Amino acid sequence: MGFRGKYFFPILMTLSLFLIIRYNYIVSDDPPLRQELPGRRSASSGDDITYTVKTPSKKTKRLFHTAVTATDSVYSTWQCRVMYYWYNRFRDEPGSDMGGYTRILHSGRPDGLMDEIPTFVADPLPSGVDKGYVVLNRPWAFVQWLQQAHIEEDYILMAEPDHIIVKPIPNLARGNLAAAFPFFYIEPKKYESVLRKFFPKENGPISRIDPIGNSPVIVTKNALMKIAPTWMNVSLAMKNDPQTDKAFGWVLEMYAYAVSSALHGVSNILHKDFMIQPPWDTETKKTFIIHYTYGCDFDMKGKMMVGKIGEWRFDKRSYGDKPPPRNLTLPPRGVPESVVTLVTMINEATANIPNWES
């Protein structure tokens, strides 16, 4: 049987039990937060660190709190700065239900953006647990944030650093129904045999699993507090199951959230206009968010160059070690409006963010 067969699942269960025990400890001992600036250590708390979350003074049941998980890498940092710039631009505009904002930093230590962006510092998973798949830290970071931070709003928008808000976002959720973007590559029916390991038949038809990830999603705070620890444990279990890990690859954590939402009976209103992903989506007119996950490569006549390095290009992966320069060259005539808007909005943000290239 070997080490894997004899000891693998006991070790996994021990780790999951440790995380659940820690989560339950946090729930039972939820201390009030001191009113300090985001990221400041409490002088009287010894080894404990508490963080405040800035929220607006107005309070309505329809406000949502925007939460963005991130690391302290240069790659993540510049995207967070652009994202936060556009959040601030639209937060108080007519039609907005946008409340407070938190960057959930799961690197385990404060970084250079603590005074620029409201930030909660979360502990990462123990070394080696993520197996190089860093987004496994996301659900564990949400568990910590939901239980340690004081969040005034009744709803949460889970977003990502590479999201640009293009207009005020209303609360798209309705009652107990969350609101989410449907991803074409999340296919529960296709992978039913794999998903049944985590969503048994007694939980209902596989169609109860929505074709979503955890972002963008607007969900009630109370529902997310129930979903998050399940999302954490399902993510770990999926990553440690070779068949599931191979089937889902880099979208594994997205499937884990979709399963966890279904396990807790939280259905989602699917909004295809919630977000667009250039260059494949060509217009921004109806959308709320640009997700620049794909590279944009075009020739100088405006024709897309699929699978090739473009004569003109924008790809966030080109800026892993340093932020993009100010005043990026705009795309040539004929390139989709969504790509032009993306680059224009990045240029506006970088022109107005102090000390950008530092």
Swiss-Prot record:
It is an enzyme of class 2 (transferase). It is found in: Golgi apparatus, cis-Golgi network membrane. The chain crosses the membrane at residues 7-26. Keywords: Glycosyltransferase, Golgi apparatus, Membrane, Signal-anchor, Transferase, Transmembrane, Transmembrane helix. Glycosyltransferase involved in the O-arabinosylation of several proteins including extensins and small signaling peptides. Catalyzes the transfer of the initial L-arabinose to the hydroxyl group of Hyp residues. Contributes redundantly with HPAT1 and HPAT3 to arabinosylation of EXT3. One of its GO terms (molecular function) is hydroxyproline O-arabinosyltransferase activity. It comes from Arabidopsis thaliana. Disruption phenotype: No visible phenotype. Short-root-hair phenotype. Hpat1 hpat2 double mutants have longer hypocotyls, are early flowering and show early senescence in leaves associated with a decrease in chlorophyll content. Hpat1 hpat2 hpat3 triple mutants fail to produce detectable levels of Hyp-arabinosides, have low fertility and shorter pollen tubes. It is a single-pass type II membrane protein. Pfam families: HPAT. The keyword Transferase applies. This is Hydroxyproline O-arabinosyltransferase 2. One of its GO terms (cellular component) is Golgi apparatus. Its EC number is 2.4.2.58. It catalyses: trans-4-hydroxy-L-prolyl-[protein] + UDP-beta-L-arabinofuranose = O-(beta-L-arabinofuranosyl)-trans-4-hydroxy-L-prolyl-[protein] + UDP + H(+). Ubiquitous.
